[in-house]
């Protein structure tokens, strides 16, 4: 085993973290193109059944991505609500950033083998992350930071680690070893490092929706770096129309009508590198092997009332592959799912039958039911 390479990785991690959340956003006149999904706008606030409904839009860069919050209602009230949502977003980012030396996650990661007092929010999202890891048997895993770093996904200096390095680092990815105490205390063992990039945006979206509700907003749309979350319906009383991208071409392949819903996609097309042998390695890691996932799935979209749940599940079910993903869906029955595969098949759960329109006929559609 080449310990010099391992020590280089662990030494680097001891002084520096990197947030792996990354996205791009391109605006068009009739819809917003995000990394994963599109919001197809047909809302006409002037015809809204909501009294004095006007749109207040907040654009912000946070968690290393571009985000938009659109709230509808009384103009002044919507602006106040958006400002409070912004404050909450920045507060959560400050707590959960893996790079900010003043964040609580950074402190936890750099004080291993010590109990750390944390904010209630940090404690809550870490508990949610561990529970999602348990629920998915490690397909979602918040402890993969050292392995992501070994592959270069935290720095952009990509390389294929030696197998001995991967096997060594896998020792430090056992999420069951994250410990919790009352009064908001957290413990992680030596050499473990937490990265909440696979759940933080969904968790944040849930908190923002809660704040908007508390401030009298009944209609809102969040686009948090490709994570879409909606509050209520559009101002005209109709459902939001969310476009799901064809992961092979970037065009809109399907549209889904939703209200009070998170629509979150994971795909292997947004962060990857191509090695010298021509093989593509994506940023989604299988925690059982330490290697980037290489299966038939091109993207997984989850619909759930919980952004936290949808965010973690979209990654977990991508890792599982199509067959195990649908077995999980049949067992839990508390979300809907749309999968696009590399060989141009699309699999959709039966709960989407009256909600989704397929716009790309190059995909063969398969409907899944509980039986």
Question: Can you describe what each PLM-predicted range is?
Answer:
Residues 2-11, 15, 19-371:
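Mature catalytic core of soluble alpha/beta enzymes
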């Amino acid at each position: 085993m080449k310990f010099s390479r391992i020590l280089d990785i662990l030494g680097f991690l001891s002084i520096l973290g990197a947030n792996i959340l990354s996205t791009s956003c391109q605006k068009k006149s009739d819809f917003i193109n995000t990394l994963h999904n599109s919001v197809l706008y047909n809302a006409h606030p002037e015809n809204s059944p909501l009294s004095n409904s006007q749109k207040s839009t907040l654009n912000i860069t946070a968690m290393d991505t571009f985000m938009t919050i659109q709230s509808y209602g009384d103009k002044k009230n919507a602006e106040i609500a958006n400002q409070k949502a912004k404050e909450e977003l920045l507060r959560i980012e400050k707590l959960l950033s893996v790079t900010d030396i003043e964040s609580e996650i950074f402190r936890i990661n750099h004080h291993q083998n010590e109990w750390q007092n944390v904010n209630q929010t940090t404690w809550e999202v870490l508990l949610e992350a561990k529970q999602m890891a348990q629920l998915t048997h490690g397909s979602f895993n918040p402890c993969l930071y050292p392995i992501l770093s070994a592959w270069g996904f935290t720095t952009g200096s990509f390389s294929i680690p030696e197998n001995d390095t991967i096997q060594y680092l896998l020792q430090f990815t056992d999420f069951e070893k994250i410990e919790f105490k009352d009064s908001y205390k957290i413990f992680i063992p030596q050499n473990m490092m937490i990265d909440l990039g696979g759940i933080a945006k969904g968790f944040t979206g849930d908190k923002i929706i809660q704040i908007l509700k508390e401030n009298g907003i009944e209609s809102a749309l969040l686009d948090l770096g490709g994570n879409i979350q909606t509050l209520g319906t559009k101002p005209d009383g109709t459902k939001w129309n969310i476009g799901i991208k064809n992961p092979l071409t970037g065009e809109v392949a399907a549209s889904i009508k939703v209200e009070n819903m998170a629509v979150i996609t994971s795909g292997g097309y947004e962060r990857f590198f191509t090695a010298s042998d021509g093989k593509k390695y994506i940023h989604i890691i299988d925690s059982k092997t330490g290697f980037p996932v290489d299966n038939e799935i091109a993207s997984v979209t989850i619909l759930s009332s919980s952004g936290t749940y949808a965010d973690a599940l979209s990654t977990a079910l991508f890792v599982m592959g199509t067959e195990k993903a649908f077995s999980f869906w049949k067992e839990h029955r508390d979300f809907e799912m749309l999968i696009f595969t590399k060989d141009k098949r699309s699999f959709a759960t039966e709960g989407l039958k009256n909600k989704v329109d397929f716009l790309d006929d190059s995909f063969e559609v398969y409907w899944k039911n509980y039986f």
